[in-house]
Amino acid sequence: MSFNTNETDRLLSTTRSVKKRLDLEREVSEEVLLDCIEIAEQAPTGGNQSSRRWLVIRDPKVKKEIAELYREMGGQFLKEQSERLDGTGHHNEKTIKASSYLAEHLEEVPVLVLVTIYG
């Protein structure tokens, strides 16, 4: 198998986080989820310590509770910033609007994955 470094560089330099275009109806298989966690495990850690634990949440009630906490802690700020920047062309306008959208719809995502670090 060949490795295309140009394509890798292109992907790493053009791929941004996706918040507004999430497919909230699409299920995430266990296989895909585990593949994503496996890839994320390759990220460096301080002192090369493996101190991460992954919490996978599919339960709608738990997702709703987490979403409510998330909105309680920062949702109002995101909403206010989104309204303040709307139509200004500010370089953070799209990011804040997308973050505000995600905060409003967080419990609708098929699965939440929280990474914890201990030590």
What is each stretch, according to the model?
Residues 8-10, 53, 109-111:
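A generic secondary-structure signal marking the coil-to-beta-strand transition
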Residues 38-44, 53, 100-101:
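Short secondary-structure capping/turn segments at boundaries of alpha-helices and beta-strands
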Residues 15, 40-43, 69-73:
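Alpha-helix boundary/capping residues
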Residues 47-58:
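Short loop-to-beta-strand entry elements in the cores of soluble alpha/beta enzymes
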Residues 25, 29, 35, 45, ...:
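General N-terminal targeting signals
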Residues 1-35, 42, 49-50:
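Specificity-determining recognition surfaces
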Residues 56-119:
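Glycine/small-residue-rich phosphate/adenosyl-binding loop
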